[in-house]
């Protein structure tokens, strides 16, 4: 418990870690594509982001070493990589930890969406394998609601004093009465029961979106339906014209972020980051139908124009 710090959310915790452990100009590996909110937070501190590609096993450690083996830290989302949905393999987790030990670097583990795993056992956190180099960032924004503004850090014992000092220079800690209320919910089993109810609902929502896109988009969209999380990624095929994703989104009249928004280096086809929490089934089906049809129409028109 002495290594757990309560913060106002993941971005607050990440900012504390940077202020406590790094200096402006220090190099930080960042998944590319990656979570845009964390990208903005890191850039605001003055560190230098080193974009590292992601494949089917997570962040490509060898590519990171080639780009900057002496980086001071790495920011990763190993449980449910944003936005690809990939879960980092155990081999890749070990490789990342080995690099951190050799380089004397820190790993900021954002355990994004780990609570909503739909199949298989829970994944082993990096902090559970190599705790001395890992700062674990967690939040209740997805399990409860974002407006709660409560998250937490699990910090290696040797770093606690530095992170506490950084927090004392900012806002001390979130309101205690909210922490007490949340602690009561946890102790009474309310949150665990809530999670058990919501997992099958979100799994069903994922399947509704994936099935509708498969039906209406055909080969115009390639789907990655992950085994956890609250969004899926639908990408355009290789060779899709530049700007097609924006046109498709506009014609479909949906709100979503594009895959290109999450990229530092623009490479590969664009796509759509599709969240499915908080919507009725008929709304999800309708949005997926419009997106699939718009993708078919725009790409068909582009093909005829060539």
What are these regions (language model features)?
Residues 200-210, 221-235, 242-248:
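Conserved glycine-rich beta-strand-loop-beta hairpin in the small C-terminal domain of fold type I
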Residues 1-103, 115-129, 133-135, 202, ...:
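Conserved core of the PLP fold type I
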Residues 30, 51, 109, 182, ...:
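Hydrophobic residues in well-ordered beta-strands that form the structural core
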Residues 155, 233-239, 255-296:
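Conserved PLP-binding active-site segment of the aspartate aminotransferase-like
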Residues 78-82, 142, 279:
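Short glycine-rich anion-binding loops that position phosphate/pyrophosphate groups of nucleotides
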Residues 135-215, 222-224:
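PLP-dependent aminotransferase class I/II
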Residues 20-22, 40, 95-96, 107-108, ...:
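A generic "structured core" feature
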């Amino acid at each position: 418990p002495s290594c757990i710090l309560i913060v106002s959310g993941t971005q607050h915790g990440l900012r504390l870690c940077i202020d406590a452990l790094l200096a402006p100009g220090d190099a930080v590996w960042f998944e590319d594509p990656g979570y845009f909110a964390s990208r903005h937070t890191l850039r605001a501190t003055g560190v230098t982001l080193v974009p590292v590609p992601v494949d089917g096993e997570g962040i490509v450690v060898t590519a990171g070493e080639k780009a900057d083996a002496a980086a001071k830290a790495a920011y990763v989302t190993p449980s449910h990589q944003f936005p690809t949905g990939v879960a980092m393999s155990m081999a890749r987790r070990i490789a990342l930890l080995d690099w951190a030990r050799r380089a004397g670097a820190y790993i900021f583990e954002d355990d994004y969406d780990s609570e909503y795993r739909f199949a298989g056992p829970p994944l082993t956190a990096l902090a559970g394998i190599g705790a001395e180099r890992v700062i674990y960032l967690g939040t209740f924004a997805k399990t409860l609601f974002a407006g709660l503004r409560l998250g937490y850090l699990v910090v290696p014992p040797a770093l606690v004093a530095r992170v506490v000092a950084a927090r004392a220079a900012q806002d001390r800690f979130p309101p205690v009465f909210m922490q007490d209320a949340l602690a009561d919910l946890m102790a009474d089993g309310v949150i665990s029961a809530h999670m058990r109810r919501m997992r099958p609902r979100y799994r069903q929502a994922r399947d509704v979106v994936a099935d509708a896109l498969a039906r209406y988009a055909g080969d115009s969209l390639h789907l990655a339906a992950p085994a956890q999380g609250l969004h899926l990624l639908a990408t355009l095929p290789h060779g899709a014209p530049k700007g097609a994703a924006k046109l498709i989104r506009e014609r479909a009249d949906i709100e979503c972020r594009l895959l290109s928004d999450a990229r530092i280096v623009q490479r590969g086809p664009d796509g759509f980051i599709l969240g499915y929490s908080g919507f009725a089934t008929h709304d999800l089906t309708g949005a997926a139908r419009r997106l699939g049809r718009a993708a078919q129409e725009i790409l068909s028109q582009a093909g005829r124009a060539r």
